[in-house]
């Protein structure tokens, strides 16, 4: 992740996020760990919980805590009660910014009283489902900060949908079937951004 590494180095020198609290409800993976490290290098206090307990990499969560001093509330396979408690733990940090995958964190902050979201100045949401929840808050007149719809960004379609999903799809097929691709015939249903990546 050379771009993120470059940002982390610049952030470490400039510290643009000093005094900023970031709460993230994302997949706890090595990729997310690099994002957390970049934010922390920039001076942010970061609290991370899992957007999906089944994707949590326990070794990554442990490394973030032990090697980098991050606040991580996640465990692979945690039950619904533990998941909810971990989202609450991040919300209790009274973040300035949230990074969400499913809108659990930003929704919880808006369900609480004004004090719970008093410092909230912005958020990001990665998923279509999460954006439906955010737009519901907006329609009710309850959304108190701008939310960046990551999933609707042109760069998301180009890089993640096209290249990332294409790569992940082929990788998943290869791992699940143990087939050699040479000489195989594939049928790709749909030929949008994602289908072209496959």
Report each predicted region and the residues it spans:
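Glycine-rich phosphate/diphosphate-binding loop of Rossmann-like nucleotide-binding domains
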Residues: 26-43, 156, 160, 164-198
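Glycine/serine-rich phosphate-binding loop and adjoining beta1-alpha1 elements at the start
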Residues: 1-17, 48-184
């Amino acid at each position: 992740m050379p771009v993120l590494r470059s940002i982390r180095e610049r952030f470490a020198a400039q510290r643009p996020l000093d005094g900023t609290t970031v709460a993230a409800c994302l997949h706890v993976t090595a990729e997310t760990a690099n994002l957390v490290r970049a934010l922390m290098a920039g001076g942010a206090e970061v609290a991370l919980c899992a957007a999906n307990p089944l994707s949590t990499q326990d070794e990554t969560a442990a490394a973030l805590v032990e090697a980098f001093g991050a606040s991580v509330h996640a465990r692979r396979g945690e039950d619904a009660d533990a998941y909810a408690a971990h989202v609450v733990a991040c919300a209790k940090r009274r973040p300035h910014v949230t990074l969400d995958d499913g809108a659990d964190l930003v929704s919880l902050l808006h369900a609480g009283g004004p004090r719970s979201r008093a410092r909230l100045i912005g958020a990001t949401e990665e998923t279509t489902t999460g954006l439906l929840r955010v737009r519901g808050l907006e329609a009710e007149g309850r959304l108190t900060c701008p939310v960046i719809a990551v999933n609707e960004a042109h760069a998301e379609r180009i890089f993640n949908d096209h290249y990332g999903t294409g790569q992940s799809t082929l990788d998943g097929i290869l791992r699940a079937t143990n087939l050699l691709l040479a000489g195989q015939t594939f049928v790709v249903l749909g030929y949008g951004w994602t289908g072209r990546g496959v």
